[in-house]
């Protein structure tokens, strides 16, 4: 099955995905930049106005009569032909002025010159990548600094990106239905033509709902930074935000012809080849494992050991760690790590100074993946940096066919990250020394908890989105009941408020089950590595090389000899769970 959906409602979902915080698109791109003889209104990022500027760059009125376009050389050196040789420190965001973009898009619909239409299309695509990159840079600044100005900038750049995408899609659709229909369709390709030939611009209501989503997400981020509110007060306000998001998203799903937002998100946001019903069946089937896990594993004494210097790493040491192990993954992984380090395409810092997040995104104008991870000063820093580097590796080696419409499987993206976590287990003697046993328990526990928590939050979200009239008190109660059904003990009222600290509930609904699905695949890689590490590493690199754009999760696993949870859950999980339980019980018996 090709991961391609050709419908207006899917394109609208793709626009929404570009605005999801914390799970940015991982699709590098970039090509030679065609430009009009009239200078574009927004300068290349490396020559833009200083970062955190809320003022658009000054522009002259667009001179459409000065077209046709001419081609110019790529603005960036790309020594490998793909990734720009630009340091992150030289990338700056600013507010893009849409004047020329809108005028050029209008021109695409009416030109009768085949050469001009092609040049306009290429220029618009490049400018769209620029706008997307400016939005990503603004969000990175927000997570790094969290000022009110950064918050306002994110809302502004999100709105610009949404407007630019809608304008671009509509312009391409008009050209596909215009006087140059056949020639233009041949130039942009069959996939693009099928996807956009019937595109309709967003209605005012759609735009209003999507902009409201951004506003509410920013309110949520601002709320979590407050220290003057009690936990119940925080939960109440977060609940109000979540329930308004649920209302807006349910309305959008109905506009696009879906019965439920879950159906819409599974198909159109995340490119899944399994359904919400399949996920619900997984949630039910995982509960016996979860009850055993919370009884025998979750409170293992190994988690309470101070690992001290064995687990502590500075940001520089974490980058060096990746530099040491990346060549043992593959030459391509080593190249990705060297590119990241050479150009400073990462932010690692204490959770006391930056937002508590881990993500990898792609700065599309530069085809440059960027890794962000907040640090706790413990073992999780090492595990999470391997996790995020799995995403980075994939983003570096895999480019989508088309930046506008290619949509990958987010479940497969997460195999790239959790799979590397599973393989790093084999290096723990070297990394942790005499604390390797505790580290191994932590690693397996983390992957197992990914599965359980992925199910918990998917079940929670499916309930909330199907009961939009519930109150905040009911929200807390339902979450607590779901935890109990998995065997989780509720030690205090605070446990019922945990959902508010998971940003995915607000920013990327129905994403969390991807952690469960991916870990079920990655634990199979871990099991293979127990008996033949080279074979397991070869399998992992094969998975990464296939990317996430051509096959869905279930299809991909079957094609490489792994088992999908939709076929046999025990085959995915039984060996790894038994190993974790045995390790925990043995460790506790010695304590």
Can you name each region flagged by the protein language model?
Residues 19-22:
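C-terminal motif of bacterial Sec signal peptides marking the signal peptidase cleavage site
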Residues 366-385:
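Short pre-active-site segment immediately N-terminal to the catalytic Zn-binding motif
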